[in-house]
Design a protein with these regions (language model features):
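Mixed-charge (Asp/Glu-Lys/Arg
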Residues: 1-36, 41-140
């Protein structure tokens, strides 16, 4: 992928999430503004779930749990402030995807960041994100 800016990276995460959940048979709804703590609402069998989308272009695959914005990139919120959020959908620079229940992030005690992994960490230490990796063809 060529050099892209933060806005484009965010659009990649959002569009990949829409594609994934649509292929899983969900109805995907987008809010009219961007002031809420979720990016998508997904519905299947009458059950609504909220999704926050994050994407990274870093080599490490690090995803910040903090939301930043404005002209100076100031932190204005944190995913962990919203225990009612259902899923964190993440995309890395290789367009690999993860769908992580936020309750699992909270249970693990992560407060600022997670690292997207395709395999377990050495000694299985830390939050094991590889368990939540998904593909378009997965069954929901």
């Amino acid at each position: 992928v060529n050099e892209i800016n933060r806005k484009q990276i965010g659009r990649i995460g959002l569009s990949m999430a829409i594609n994934y959940f649509t292929c899983q048979g969900y109805t995907v709804s987008l809010p009219l503004n961007d002031t809420q703590w979720y990016d998508l609402i997904i519905e299947k069998d009458g059950i609504l779930k909220t999704v926050q989308c994050k994407a990274t272009q870093t080599e490490s695959g690090e995803i910040s749990l903090r939301n930043t914005g404005g002209t100076k990139g100031a932190v204005y919120d944190n995913i962990i402030n919203h225990s009612e959020l259902d899923f964190l959908f993440c995309v890395n620079k290789n367009l690999d995807m993860w769908c992580i229940p936020v309750k699992d992030i909270l249970k693990a005690g992560n407060r600022n960041r997670i690292v997207l992994q395709n395999t377990p960490t050495v000694n299985n230490q830390g939050f094991q994100t590889y368990k939540y990796q998904v593909q378009i063809l997965d069954k929901a």
